[in-house]
Each structure stands twice: as C-alpha cells, then as structure tokens.
Amino acid sequence: MFERTLVDLIRGIRNHKKNETKFINQCINEIKEELKGDMQKKTVAVQKLTYIQMLGFDISWASFKIVEVMSCNKFSSKRIGYLAASQSFNEGTDVIVLATHQIRKDFLSSNQSEAYLALNCLSNICTTDLARELANDILTLLSTQKTHILKRAITVLYKIFLRYPESLRPAFPKLREKLDDPEPSVVSCSVNVICELARRNPKNYLPLAPVLFRILTNTTNNYWMLIKIVKLFAALTPHEPRLGKKLIDPLTNIINSSPSVSLLYECIQTCITGMSDHIPLMKLCISKLRTLIEHNDQNLKYLGLLALNNIMKIHPKAVSEHRDLVLNCLEDDDISIRLRALDLLPGMTSKKNIGDIVFKLLDHLDNAEGQYKEQIIEKIIELCSMGTYQFITDFEWYINILVKLSQIQDSIHGKLIASQLLDVVIRVKIVRAYSTRQMIELLKNPKLMSNPTEGGMCEVLYAAAWIVGEFSGYVNRPIDALEAFLQPRVCVLPSHIQSVYMLNSLKVFSHACAKANGDKIPSLDDDDEEEEAQEEEDQNEITHEIVQECLEIIKSRLTIFTHSIYLNVQERACLINELLSFYTVTKEQGNNISKELISLFTEQLNPVGPKAQKKVPIPEGLDLDEWINDPKHQEPIEEDEDDDIFNTSTSSHQKKHHKHHRGGYDGDDDEDDETNSSHSGHSSSNFNRHPIDIQRQKEERLRKQANNPYMLGGKVSKKLSTNDPENIPVVQLTGDLGHLHVGASSNRPMPSKGSKKTKKHYTIDTTTEMPEGAKESDDEDEKDNKYKNDALSNINLSEPLTASDVLHTSRHRTDIIKEKEREMAMLAKKNAKLSPKSPPSTANYSEVTSPEIAPAKKATKKAAAGSNPPPPPTAKKSSKKPAATSSTTTTTKSTQAAAAVVAPPPVIVKKVLKTILDDDNFKITCEILKVSPSNETDNNQIKLTMKVQNKTDEDMSDVSISLKNPAEQCVSIKNSGEIGVLEADASTTHTELLNVVNVLNSQELQFTLLASPSSSPSITNQLSIDLPFSFFIVATKLPKDKFAEILQKSGQVSAMDSTKITGQSLTMPLVIEKLAQQLSIEVVQAHPNGQTASFYAKTTQNHHIAMLVKEKDGNISFDIKSPQSLLNQILVKEIAQLTFSSK
C-alpha cells in the first residue's frame, strides 16, 4: 500500500480544501495502521500526527506510540518523538510517567543534542509527578561543565519550581552559585529564573542584592540580562528602602548613556517604584519619556505614555506640565495611543482647564466610533465627577454637558449618564430648578425613544422622569411635563422606565394642586423658594383651571397604561387612576386633599454610600451558614393546583399595593415583581404560616425600605451622619454664571470673569446614607494579591535548610528491601548489646513479602554472602525450647548472622576543587573527582576537570595540556584532547581520566601547559596537582580479634611513626568523628576511660593502616603502623591537615 510522507500529507491537505476534515480523518486511519509497523514507519506516522495536531485535531490516542518513538536510539527518530510529546502531551496524559526514565537517561547522554531534546521537552510537558521525579537529576546537571546543557538546565528549573514548589529550598543554593559563574550566558539564565521567582515573593531574594548590584555595575553590553536585573530591583526596592538610594547612580548612568530603549524603560519603571522621592531623578525620567512620546515609533510612544501614567500617580504636577503633548496624542491614528492619552487626563485636570479639556474631548467625540467613543464619554464623566465634583464651578454647565452626551445615539453609557444626573441634582440643591426645566425638554426629545433597548441611552429618560417628579415643585408648566410623561410612544420604553413615568406623573399633579391652593411645598428649601419666587414673576401662575386640565390629560391618557403587558406598569397606572378618582370625588364633595396628596412625596433624600451594602453589620444571633428554609422540610408544589393561580396573582397584587412606590434609579422593578410572583406561589401552598415568621418578614421588608434612599413614604431612617449641609464651606466662583440653554449653551466654555450675571454659590452635599453600626475601618479596600494562595510564594528561603528539605529520589524496590534488612540487622545488634542474655525482640517477627519480591531477597542474600567474609565464630548457648519453636530459632540465628556481617558502605564520589594556576595569561581551576568503580580493577580512577580561562586580550592557539608522570605512577586512560584555539577572555574545559598505578608514589600529578599567543612568544607552564590521599583509603569495619591478628603478623604493619596535635583542647569523640569523616579511618575499640582508642583502615591497594590514639590534657598523640614508612609519612601529613571543629 502506498504510504504518505509528511510532504504528501501537506500537499493532500492543500488539494482537499473543500473536504479537508474528511481527508484528514482518512489519513488518521492510515496512520493508525502505520503505527503497527516497524520503528521507521512509526517515526513517519508520529511526524504526520504532529502536523495534524497543529491543525487542531486530537492525537491523544497515540501517546503511547509517541513514547516508543522517544525511546528510539536513533537520533532522528528521537527528535521527532520529543517534538510530538512537546506538542501533544499535557497534564492529563496518562502515559507521561512512562517517559520519566527515558528523559533521565537522555540527560546523561554523551550526545549533547539528546540532552537538549530532553530538557526542551521537559519544559513543555512538566507535570507535578515529572518535576518530583526529575528535580534531583536537573540539580545534578547544574554541576556539568557543558555550558549549553547548563543554561538549559537552569532555565528548566523554573518549570520544576512551579510544578514542585518543595524543590525550591534544597535547589536554591546551587542556583545562587550560578550567579558567580564566569560564563555570562549562565549568569543571564540564573537571573531570568530568579527574576520570575521574585515576582511571587520578593522578600526571599533580598540577600541577593549585593551580587545583583555587582552584576549590574560590571555588565555593559548584555542588555537582556540588565533588563532582568533592573526588573528584579524594581521588585526588591519596595521592601528595602536603602537599596533605592544605592541604585540612584547606576540607574542614572544607564538612563543617560544606554542606547537600548527597552532598558531605558525598565530603569524608569524601577525609579518610579523605588526612588519616586528623588526629584532630580524623576525629572530626568520625565524628560526621557517626553522624547519617547515625541518619537515617530508608535511602540515607543505607547511605552512613554504608559510610564508617564505611572509617574502621574506620584507626581501629578510634574506630569501636568506636558498637557499639550498628551492632548496632541488624542489625534493619533493609533487607538491604543489615544486610550493611553485618555488615562493621563485625570492627573492633568484642574478647575482652570477642565472646560478646555472637556470641549477638546467633545470635539473628538464627533468623529469617534466604537469603543473609543464609549471611552471618551466615560472619561468626560470621570473628569467632572472626580473628588465629588471638586473641579466643577458651574453645575449648570455640567448639566448641559450631560444632556449633550445623552443625545449621542448607540451608546452603552445610558445608565452612567443617568446616575450622574441623579447624583448631581441630589447633591447640589441650587441646580435643581435649572435641572428640572432641562429634564422636561429632555423628556420631549424623540431621539431618546428611537432606540428603546434596556441598558441603552433611553435609560437617561429614567433619571429625567425621576428628577422632574421628585422636584416637581420647580415645575411651572405641569401640562408640558404630563404630556411628556403620558405621550403614547412611552409604551415602547422598557417597563422600569414606564413605571417611573407613571409614579412621577402623580408627583407633578400633586405639586400642581398644592401650588394652585397656595400650600407650602415642604420639599423646597428657603433659598429655593426665593429663587422660585423670582422666576415666577415671568411665568404664568398655576390656577385651578390648569389643575383641572392636568387631571383630564392624566385620565384620558392613562387608559393605555392600565392595560399594559407589564405588571409593574399596570399596577402603578391603576393606583394613580384610583387616587385621582378619589381626588375627584372628594373635590366634588367640597373637600380638598391636596395637602394629603403632597405629603406622600416629602421625605428628604440623601445619596447612598458606595459601600453601604458592604458595611451592613451582621445582626446578633444571625448565622449566615444556617438554612433559612431547610430544603428537607419544604413541601413540593403540586402541578395540579392550577385553580390557585388567581389567588396567587391576587395576593401579589395586594402585596404590591402595600409596597411604597420607588422613585430611585435601580431598575429592579421587574425583578421585584418576578420575585414576588414566585414567592406568592409558594405562600399559597403554605398559607398557614406562623405569626412569628410573618412578623419577621415584615420587619425585614421595612428595614430594607428604610435603607433605600429612593423609597418614598414610611419612617425616616436614622442617619449616622450629623453634618449639616448648610454648614459646608461655600465654593467661591471666579466669575458670574451665564444662563444656559439646551442645544447651544453646552458648546461654550466655563464662565469667565467678564460675565455679568449674579454669582451663584454652589453647595455640594456630601452626606451619604450608611447602615447603623458601620465602622470607618470598613472603608478600606481589600487588596488582592495575585499570588496570595500560590504555594511557591509561601516558601521562605531565609530559614536554614532542615532534614526535610531534600529532593525526592526514586529507588528500586530491591534497594528499599536491602535498607530494611540493614535497619533490622542494626536494631538486632543494638538489642543484643543492651540485653545479651535474652534474644533480640525482632526474632519473634518476620516480614511478610509478596512472591515477586521473595526471589529478589534471595538473590540479595546470595550476593551479600558472596561479597562479604563469614562472621567470626561466637559462643552458642544451649537452647531448651521445644521443637515447635524451631522456626523462631532459625529466624533468630539468621538475624544475628546478618547483624554480624557489616554490609559495605555505599560508594561516595569524592570531589575537591583547587586553583592550580593564576597568572597574567591563564587561570586554571581543577575539579578532582574520585570515580565510582565499576569493578575492582577500576578502584583507583581519578577524573580531572580543568577549566582554562584566557585572561589576555589576544587569542591563544595550539593550547594543550599533557601528563608528565611516568607510567609506573599513573596512566591517562582518556582525555578530551588538544584544546586548540582559545579566544581572548574565553574559557573552556579539559578533562583527564587517570588510573593511579601506585597510590603511594602518585601524590603529586605533573602536567605541562603549552600555548601560542597570536603576537607573543610561546608559553609553557608546569602544573602541579596534589591528590588527597583520602581518595585511596577504604573505610573498613574490623572486629577486635582480626585487628589483633593483623598486628601480631610480622611484615603486615612493620613500619611505625608518631605525631602529635597540641593546643586545640581536643576530645576523643571529636577525633573519632573527624578521622571517620575526613580520612575514612574507623574506630576498632575505645577504652572505657575515653582517652585511648584503636583505629583501622586499608588502602585501595590493600595496605593495612593501624593507629593508636591517646588523649591527655587536650593533646592528641597518634601512633601509626603500616607496611611502608612512606605511607606513614603520608598519613602524618594528612593528619596535620585535618580540621577539628566541634560544629
């Protein structure tokens, strides 16, 4: 069958554009068959699946085949498998755990490209399980000398920390060491990881400030790393104020001299964050930002405006000097530039320039479209309402601005404009008369009814109707207002607006009746009455004929609303109809109820606090977690009770008549009616409720109505604020205010000093309604931390590492079994010492294992028996136990035998780091490693890793390092070859794998370094490396009788030497500890007086070492015996270099 390649697949997809999905599904079926073939077919199939996945198709069904291709030994196949895994694997992929071993294996591959693939793939598919299993391996890679692998390993650490936060504490010391690495790219990777970590918890990384400051001052051309360091300092400076003072000079130099705009921007951001109180530096930053804003590049202009916005929050006056530059940005073609310029306007606004700024925005509003138009409307209202209208000196001007904004079609800010109209009229009493007249004109505007969608600009009619009705005492032409309220086209408006129209038409009629009868209107203040009296000189008085005409208009036009499809509109229309009928009847009887009618709408209103709902205290005894109506005790509503629907509606209708009518702008009438309707259905099925519940619900309803500022009637709620609005200081205006008219007057600026009209004194009422028991502390906003619940941000790096701060290490089950056996043997041995006359307590217990593990245990025991010598014979005691306890006896003997055999300690790879050359030309550091032996013949292998750095300004050629020691001392098994060319200021590594033939004569290794500078004579240096003899000492536990046998045999320890350590106040336990730790020499027997002990060890070439140590008056003497005096001299030298410390 013909098999498609990737090229064929792509060509086929392009040729089947009309039925692309069908063609791809056909290819997937073919690929499923190819995945059953050999590895080459699987590789091609996985490659095609990767491309199909990029087109959006799911290939999770092939995850196992992808893992198979990843495990292929062929690099080309492995690369395709890793790419497919990076593209398709996620946290929900089950087979991802099968790739753990393969990734770990590729980390240590001799082919660096395979290590690259594994690291790149891990960064994409890292899960919690993978991070936990591979964290230790990544940490091991940080010790590699291969720079490219090291950089990738450091970068992958960040993904490890995100998925497995517990690895941060044990891994952070090694990450911190890489900040001192001589390779700049390694330092850059470390800075990147630390910068990302510091965004979560900056305090953890304050101790790194000195190292980072040194990198900042010493780095010149690595702009990417400098950007990261500067961003890191921006996170640290808020937590350490002294750091900001230290950064002033280097940041000033970078801002003045750096050609990198990105670095300049980050430096300015850091200055804003941590050095905002340094005025010269802030002026420098603002001047640099001005050059960015004036640049032709749109990206630079955007960054300049963004940074200027951050400075404006701290130094608004300094930014306001550049108002003209920001206003010019409003004319930019890029909408993102214009939006950023809008964000800067609040910091540049004052009483003097608010008129110019608003009219500038209105000019742009004429040509604006879409989202930008909405942003301009929102920004105009934001500028004018800042600080409770602190910049507004002419509220009539602001009312006209709002009216002009309400005439913009297809805007979504109808509710915002409506709320502003309500807020201004409620707070500023002197503007109420003017606003009322303007709202009547607004109600007649047919444009607002052309798009009667809920939430649109028709929402302004809600506020207009409410203002006209609430302050209808200022209405001198009630007929105009009622005709606007009851015009037929009102029926197309949303229901909540219609209901407000109904209620406020009654308010207008009530005030007209009161005026016609000469009654005092309680809602008007004294100042308002004087103004009203002056304006009535030119206006017609309201007569009884006008009232009768108003009554006829309402009755004639109310019929359409009493038959409305909206329940709330119909209810209020019927209510008004009944009230007017009652008014007509009482009037015919000669009674005047105008005072009673006007008394329904005389309650004083105050704005509601913006956080009033949040500050409502929880009543004592109220449990918010307890069910109000337990669902378990609710009776289900039966569907066959259809005859109750009329009772339900009647109940709802009666309940609505008992409600006080709303006048506020909340738009919740529909929701209230639906809620009442749903609750009435429930009440009909549970009609006989307890009187206590009825009383509680009544009190709850009255409390809500008392706290509603727009609820008319009822008792006046208790106010917390005792401030008298009349005692608020009067704002002195700069000039007279001219008369404004809708349509033309909104285009004029704020009044100037040349105006001739009498001054008006505006008083802004800042009183707000708050619930009882509210506290001032409740006014604080809760600042949400993005990483508040992040596990990585909660880790404290300042605490010292503990025993629990270790990385997870996966072990085979046989290793776990061996460890348990050793623990049991040690426990048995300890118990035998404590009670030698009784058998160990562990003899009565045996571990129950699964059949799969039992063979492994047998193999382990056989291996242990073959590698360890038999235990020394011990005296056996006679046992008188019955035969039934033979199994127990056998277990006891085997346990005691295991206790006698000391398992060899695990092989520890020792490491020493030395500087072997540091002159004007080269610096060479050497890492000496004791290689873990694969067999007995490899027990003396040493690996040397030399890092060679060219310190000169010229290139070196023919660089080589060669061993000079004779073959009878050591032999070079493998090396990295000639170094070759070493560029100026560059570094490289040279490795040597040596086999030490004679451990006694190879304490000093000799090498020759040759190099040829480009413009100087050849260089020859002799290198000398001292090998620690502790590399060749094997820790051996030896019984006392064997130790005595070695001392008695002639020739095994014939040479003897002595040394003494004085003046350190040493103790025998400390000497025993240091000899075991630093020289691997184990104690054989310690005298009970604690002043004498014997020690034993042997070399890797089976030289016996016996030692007797005596302590007297804080001085320690060492008597050493070995086969050769040269060995004694080496040991004396090693003992002299021991570091004795009690820590």
Swiss-Prot record:
Residues 520-541, 634-692, 704-728, 741-792, 829-899 are annotated as: Disordered. Gene3D superfamilies: Leucine-rich Repeat Variant. One of its GO terms (cellular component) is endosome membrane. Residues 840-849 have a biased composition (Polar residues). Keywords: Coiled coil, Endosome, Membrane, Protein transport, Repeat, Transport. Residues 526-550, 814-835 form a coiled coil. Residues 854-867, 881-899 have a biased composition (Low complexity). Pfam families: Adaptin_N, Alpha_adaptinC2. Residues 524-540, 666-675 have a biased composition (Acidic residues). Residues 914-1016 form the GAE domain. It is found in: Endosome membrane. One of its GO terms (biological process) is protein targeting to vacuole. PANTHER family: AP-3 COMPLEX SUBUNIT DELTA-1 (PTHR22781:SF12), DELTA ADAPTIN-RELATED (PTHR22781). Adaptor protein complex 3 (AP-3) is a heterotetramer composed of two large adaptins (delta-type subunit and beta-type subunit), a medium adaptin (mu-type subunit) and a small adaptin (sigma-type subunit). Belongs to the adaptor complexes large subunit family. Part of the AP-3 complex, an adaptor-related complex which is essential for the compartmentalization of the endocytic pathway. This is AP-3 complex subunit delta. It comes from Dictyostelium discoideum.
